Amino acid sequence: MKKKFISFNETNRFSKLTTSYLSQAESLHPFYGLFPSIENFKKQIELKKGSYSNNHRQILASTLKDQYNSISNSIAVQKNLSLLKNENTFTITTGHQLSLMTGPIYFLYKIVSTINLCKRLKQHYPNSNFVPIYWMASEDHDFEEVSSFRFENKNIRWPHQVEGAVGEMSLEKLQPVLDFFEQQLGSHANARNLKEIINHSYRISKTLSEATFRLVNILFGDYGLIVIEPQTPKLKELFKPILKEELSKGSSFSSAIKQIENLKRGFDPN
């Protein structure tokens, strides 16, 4: 198969800021640390070794193991859950909203890219372990962005009113939407496989978080992808000092404002 690669600039789909970053423009160097090239990960690994406490690591590993107690998981997932306890294990994390049926295709691209990066890093740095993580944005409140998906030029929407975190939404009223979608699929082999996936994710789950967790695990569990549900008391406890710092000093807000002003002065978007 012949492959043709198109540069980000040629697509005309990305901002000048994005393409300048990807081309490692010198004017942007002050605004980030290491560019994520394979070679730079060597230094990044050394930096991360000293920035994450073993206590936090053990809490994370224990919490994730608990989250998988009710989920059928693969040998690859079990292996990576155990590897998280080791100090020479590092995570590559992607995140996305709980889009219905995965929603836009970049939901899948993000996860595939994360898994592939872990494989490449393991080849280059065999003495370290790399675990792909999908962080569920279960606390997001924008239901409109996750409530629909497209299939064969049809926009299939979940007509539902909701307030609060989308991850906590009950799936009781989703069943008619699933029925309609399955009718559109037909009865061929791939359709039957997809219906089976729906049955083992959305049909048996009580909340959108649980369904998305199960769906992503079915699709990518064999590749060792770990799904993390952030709405967990143990993980929130680790977040307390950071939240306290932000509420009392506004550290990240102040830093972001300063960076934006510096960016305006030091980068020409035209």
Summary of predicted features, one role per range:
Residues 1-113, 117-270:
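N-terminal targeting/trafficking signals and adjacent low-complexity tails
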